[in-house]
Amino acid sequence: MEPVGKAKFVEKDWGSETWMANNELEDYCGKILHIKEGQSSSMHYHLDKHETFYILDGQLMVDLINTSDGAQYDPIIMSKGETLEIKRGQPHQLIAHEGDVTFFEVSTFHKDEDSYRIWRNLI
């Protein structure tokens, strides 16, 4: 079997994403994200995208806003080998906790217009 393509590398202010797949027809996406020490994504949510994270290296702090309980703030610290599911509509921010962090993101198809920012990274 021959390789079907090359991964797409996307530079970000906070680090980088390596896109292994983003298939609209089959509704799946796979990425490796790298967040540099002291950096974070924006606080955002997706109406269509459903995500799962798997930590490869480092620690990831995921700040969640629990919208089902009066907008309660729920931070979670994840370490190597741990997973977390982010459901549609769940506000979340991804933060490198104590050094760089690298993790898999598997999800439904990624559309740029499905990222709704609540605030930019504040770190």
Feature locations, PLM:
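Conserved short histidine dyad/triad with adjacent acidic residue
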Residues: K31-K49
